[in-house]
Amino acid sequence: MRKIKPTLLGVTVLLMSALATADVVETTTLSGVGQAKYPANFSHFDYVNPSAPKYGKVTYGEVGTYDNFNRFASRGAPAAGSGELYDSLMFAPSDEIDTYYPLIASKVRYSDDYSWLELDINSNARFQDGKPITAQDVEFTFNKFMTEGVPQYRLFYKAVKSVTAIHPLTVRIEMSEPNREKLFSLAQSTQVLPKHYWQDKNLAEPLNEPPVGSGPYKVVRYQTGQSVTYELQKDYWAVNLPVNIGRHNFKQIQYDYYRDDTVMLEAFKAGEFDIRQESSAKFWASSYTGLNFDKGFIKKEAIAHNSPASTQGFVFNIQREVFSDPKVREALTYAMDFEWMNKNMFYDQYSRTRSYFQNTEYEAKGLPSTDELTILTPLKDKIPERVFTQEYQPPVTDGSGRIRQQLRVAFQLLKEAGWELKDKVMTHKETGKAFEFELLIYSPTTERIAIPLQKNLKQLGIDMKIRSVDTTQYLKRLRDRDFDMLSSAYAANPYPSPNLLIIWNSNYIDSTYNRAGVADPVVDFLTEQIAANQEHPEKLLPLGRALDRVLQWNFYLIPQWYLSQYRIATWDKFERPSVMPKYDIGLDTWWVSEQKAQLLPEKRR
């Protein structure tokens, strides 16, 4: 990275910024937090095998169905893998946080006041139909998303004044007001659409045929709703870029769809697909047996990791009147007996989720630090009192299944919230309405973990109905916020990033990421402060912990559990690098061993 003073250079692309007073930073990497790990001349990432062969086929299983190939559509269920058809301007490795290296973009220049940024497009960049990727395509992509993309996109990038092709291979982003995070985000992760393909199509609508992509894999076969097969392109333009060395090692990738997870597991054991990451503790403990295991054809591994954990829970839609009171939400947390479930259903494999930054230094523990208090004290009148006086912990039982003490606490909280028990039915004192709600699910395995909660809620006089729908209906109801409760997960947060705006800020209340429907001025303030302080790691630490505390004590979900290992079973034909990336299992770095494959039954070679 180097700084250069802008001057009048005739026909150079810096002409537009010649009179600016800010310095210009020229670089090949963009890092949201800290310094980039890899130098400008790096050859490959540390967690890949640069000599990995490009060979063989891998098949994965998916639950449900799909009906189109447009990952960006506002309705429908896109095919598995369709989101990877397009390369992004830059690429983020799995062993760093928010650092991006050249892919479609080969070089970046920006003013150090973050009012503008220019990207040079790699002259070799091509779409899968052979046509070059140009700055016009980048300009088109931004405008397409701003006019036809989801509302959250328009809101997130409203500070972007323009994205303009100033040269066939140079695009300039200008901000209406300087904003480092939005400027970098747009430059880093934009997946570039081919203008010649999309200009007469609506981005918001489903796509019945595979689009023209730019990534390493292209759709070569599909049966809508049942399977889709991608093939590695022999003439993929970016195969030798440092970000791709040692990656994309399967010649074909196929996704097959199954009715539910139980059927899919049996198909895996029978040899219908190759790799399965297990989410069910019961299946992992008791179902991975049989002839193919005895013969050594299938390998079962628990791979330990220290990656940040997702925040999984039964999520309340607090836009629903029944869940608008925090006391009601807290009361229901006492109805989940994690200790009994872990012992009797999960074979003691899990730890209890308690944080939105689980397994990171940003997890709020103990009482607020001095720096946290500096942030939180001015907001004291708008924050639950216990943020300042207690460390949050989910309710704990003795694991016996007898939770009378916990239910007594729940009864008291419900009473304080205006509810009373009448003829064994929890009833609102003013309205006379019975306490009932619906848990929306799409998987039988989710129903299994919901039933114990349902039974305990029944003891409180609360009727939780479990409503199972197919994946298409589920996605529609999620987008429409047509649900009372979901069993869902907030993605793992390795650090407090600007993405937290979309997840928690009220400006993005319509985002499907804001599962709970949170609209809280304190949460707004904290997420906006986090977005504004990305250059200051010392400020992000107390801000992240402060946000964690506020979210914890508002009881937006009934916390479930997490696992500090990857549970994965494979038909034993794969090899992987000796180093695993810190933040991912790294399946895109695995390869098929021709020698090992020959030892397997023919359909799994």
Describe the function of each predicted region.
Residues 154-199, 214-223, 368-381, 579:
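Surface-exposed binding/hinge segments that line
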Residues 24-29, 62-64, 77-80, 84, ...:
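Detector for C-terminal structural segments
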